[in-house]
């Protein structure tokens, strides 16, 4: 586990952190290109159409596991990040300055503002707050507060959709977001 220890209120290393995050982003980008994979964040608007959705459900404020935050809601921000949410824009950009400021804020007082995200099939796609997710993933945070809207797919015979419907029952009862179902019938156990 990678942990950085600093005194509260005196951290001002955002530019250095951005340089390190940029290296991680470019490394991920190159690795995905070499494998013939899409090197940027997945975009929810490109993955599904409204015709696939039965309804939307406001989930309110949820503590979302960062491992389950996998993409962005719209195409607008996708080219700013590699697929691992690390930045790929040059250090001389306004984006880099904002990312660096968020990094300093995280180390000095913590990022407290929730992001806005869509949840689809137990994965989260960021509507607002991509840089906050990036900074927290860089610092290996476990979760992030999010105001979540769930996009519920139409019920079908598709195994993953049926599994997801079982997960939603479990989630409604427990409120847990960090559980993945891999086998039908486990929700009742």
Where does each model-flagged region fall?
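Short, charged/polar connector segments at secondary-structure boundaries
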Residues: 5-127, 131, 137-138, 183-189
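Glycine- and acidic-residue-rich phosphate-binding/metal-coordinating active-site segment common to enzymes
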Residues: 116, 120-123, 127-188
């Amino acid at each position: 586990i990678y942990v950085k220890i600093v005194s509260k209120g005196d951290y001002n290393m955002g530019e250095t952190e951005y340089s390190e995050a940029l290296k991680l982003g470019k490394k991920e980008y190159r690795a995905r290109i070499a494998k013939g994979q899409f090197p940027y964040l997945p975009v929810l608007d490109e993955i599904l159409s409204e015709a696939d959705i039965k309804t939307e459900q406001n989930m309110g404020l949820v503590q979302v596991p960062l491992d389950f935050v996998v993409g962005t809601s719209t195409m607008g921000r996708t080219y700013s990040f590699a697929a691992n949410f690390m930045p790929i824009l040059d250090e001389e950009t306004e984006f880099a300055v904002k990312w660096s400021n968020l990094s300093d804020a995280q180390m000095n007082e913590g990022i407290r503002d929730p992001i806005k995200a869509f949840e689809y099939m137990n994965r989260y796609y960021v509507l607002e707050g991509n840089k906050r997710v990036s900074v927290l993933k860089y610092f290996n945070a476990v979760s992030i507060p999010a105001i979540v809207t769930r996009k519920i797919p139409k019920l079908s015979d598709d195994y993953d959709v049926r599994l997801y419907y079982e997960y939603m029952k479990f989630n409604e009862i427990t409120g847990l977001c960090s559980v993945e179902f891999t086998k039908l019938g486990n929700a009742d156990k």
